């Protein structure tokens, strides 16, 4: 009976170790943040595919509601998408005169992947 108890505890400990590893690995990989700056009056030009980006956190900022963010990040045209790594800007995509972004999901994903791979 004691052998079965020890084996059960070892298995449980192994599973807990795996869960802990997954949690730690998941929390360290969220170093890349993609922030989409836009304004309520320009919602027609929201970047709809942004949520399909992988291995990053995605945030949206309405510059009308958060003018301090607009000033801090020097947003002069909307939409603007900025990719941050560890809080530092690494790439910026800005709208053209039509207030729409020409960058593709693939272009942004490439930048995200490059940033993640630069850690290795």
Range-by-range predicted roles:
Residues 2-16:
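Bacterial N-terminal signal peptides that target proteins for export
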Residues 13-25:
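Bacterial N-terminal signal peptides
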Residues 29-57:
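Local sequence-structure signature of Cys/Sec-based thiol-disulfide redox active-site neighborhoods
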Residues 37-39, 63-64, 96:
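Active-site-proximal beta-strand/loop segments in catalytic clefts of secreted hydrolases
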Residues 46-47, 67-70, 105, 109-112:
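Extracytoplasmic/secreted envelope proteins and their assembly/folding machinery
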Residues 57-65:
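A short beta-strand-loop structural module common to alpha/beta enzyme folds
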Residues 73-83:
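Structural micro-motif
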Residues 85-120:
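Non-catalytic, surface beta->alpha helical segment in thiol-disulfide oxidoreductase systems
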